[in-house]
């Protein structure tokens, strides 16, 4: 596909059974690489607060932070659909704030859709944003912005009543107009059931193989993070060692006077 993907392309992939690939990106270089590889969707995640800025969770991330990183991503003009997270307190206070902040992420940041966390209780917010012609991706299950209420990063929906509530949440966000929904940290059978019940795509992270697509954090799959890696993460490379070796070699050559050489100098 030579043109940029739209939400209609993403939804069509569910209908045809083609798996949807999603990765987070926070900057221009990574976005260029991902797009060249043919990624379907890029999520400018509020996970930037953890893997990029060093916070313990996503709560400190602001709208201005998301705007900065969204601009960096969209400057790469990717063919992938660009979705940006709405950070904590950017949509929970009232509908007016939600509309304004979603509008800024699209108008100023260049995002093509926004993502927000929550189920049935955020359906009014989803409708309000969709009514502005801004596509919304929902996010249910383990919602990182609710870390304190959930008591940490714990799998959700293990009990029957919790599973039923998550199914109802999924149906509610679909009814409210979400074009897709992220299922995070839920049992694989529940994710499969939700995926079968919905007409919109499900994007899993720690939700097993039965979702319509998968999303992971780019720093996790590259092995860049020192911190604990969740069970659902698969490392596809060891970029941290590669970078460490390069930096160590640079330091060594400068200390020994081996760099720069005449070949790296001007006459």
From Swiss-Prot:
UniProt-listed Enzyme Commission number(s): 2.1.2.11
Question: Quick one: where is this thing mainly located?
Answer: cytoplasm
Which PANTHER family does the record match to this protein? 3-METHYL-2-OXOBUTANOATE HYDROXYMETHYLTRANSFERASE (PTHR20881:SF0)
Q: In terms of domain of life, where is this protein from? A: Bacteria
What InterPro entries has UniProt attached to this entry? Pantoate_hydroxy_MeTrfase, Pyrv/PenolPyrv_kinase-like_dom, Pyrv_kinase-like_dom_sf
**Gene Ontology CC annotations of this record:** cytoplasm
Compartments where found: Cytoplasm
Name the active site residues.
Answer: 184 (proton acceptor)
Pfam assignment, any one: Pantoate_transf
UniProt cofactor note: Binds 1 Mg(2+) ion per subunit.
Which cofactors are named for this entry?
Mg(2+)
- Which residues are listed for Mg(2+) binding in this entry? 46, 85, 117
What is annotated about its quaternary structure and interactions?
Homodecamer; pentamer of dimers.
Binding residue positions for 3-methyl-2-oxobutanoate? 46-47, 85, 115
Keyword Manganese, does the record have it?
A: no
**Which catalysed reactions does the entry list for this protein?**
3-methyl-2-oxobutanoate + (6R)-5,10-methylene-5,6,7,8-tetrahydrofolate + H2O = 2-dehydropantoate + (6S)-5,6,7,8-tetrahydrofolate
Tell me the organism's taxonomic lineage: Bacteria, Pseudomonadati, Thermodesulfobacteriota, Desulfuromonadia, Geobacterales
Q: Which BP terms does GO give this entry?
A: pantothenate biosynthetic process
Q: In which pathway does it act?
A: Cofactor biosynthesis; (R)-pantothenate biosynthesis; (R)-pantoate from 3-methyl-2-oxobutanoate: step 1/2
Q: Which UniProt keywords apply?
A: Cytoplasm, Magnesium, Metal-binding, Pantothenate biosynthesis, Transferase
Q: What is this protein called?
A: 3-methyl-2-oxobutanoate hydroxymethyltransferase
Q: Briefly, what is this protein's role?
A: Catalyzes the reversible reaction in which hydroxymethyl group from 5,10-methylenetetrahydrofolate is transferred onto alpha-ketoisovalerate to form ketopantoate.
Q: Which family does it belong to?
A: Belongs to the PanB family.
**Molecular function, one GO term:** 3-methyl-2-oxobutanoate hydroxymethyltransferase activity
């Amino acid at each position: 596909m030579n043109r940029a993907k739209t939400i209609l392309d993403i939804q069509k992939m569910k209908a045809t059974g083609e798996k949807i690939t999603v990765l987070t990106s926070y900057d221009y270089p990574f976005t260029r690489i991902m797009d060249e590889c043919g990624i379907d969707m890029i999520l400018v995640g509020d996970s930037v607060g953890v893997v990029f800025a060093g916070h313990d969770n996503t709560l400190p991330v602001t709208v201005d932070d998301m705007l900065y990183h969204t601009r960096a991503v969209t400057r790469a003009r990717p063919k992938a659909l660009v979705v940006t997270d709405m950070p904590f307190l950017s949509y929970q206070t009232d509908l007016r704030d939600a509309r304004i902040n979603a509008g800024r992420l699209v108008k100023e940041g260049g995002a093509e859709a926004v993502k927000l966390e929550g189920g049935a209780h955020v359906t009014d917010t989803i409708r309000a944003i969709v009514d502005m012609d801004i596509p919304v991706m929902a996010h249910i299950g383990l919602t990182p912005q609710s870390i304190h209420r959930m008591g940490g990063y714990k799998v959700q929906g293990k009990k029957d009543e919790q599973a039923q509530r998550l199914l109802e949440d999924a149906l509610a966000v679909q009814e409210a107009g979400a074009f897709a929904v992220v299922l995070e940290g839920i049992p694989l059978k529940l994710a499969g059931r939700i995926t079968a019940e919905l007409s919109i795509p499900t994007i899993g992270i720690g939700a097993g193989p039965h979702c319509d697509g998968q999303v992971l954090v780019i720093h996790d799959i590259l092995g860049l993070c020192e911190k604990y890696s969740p069970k659902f993460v698969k490392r596809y490379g060891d970029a941290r060692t590669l970078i460490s070796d390069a930096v160590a070699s640079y330091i060594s050559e400068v200390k020994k006077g081996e760099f720069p050489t005449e070949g790296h100098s001007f006459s």
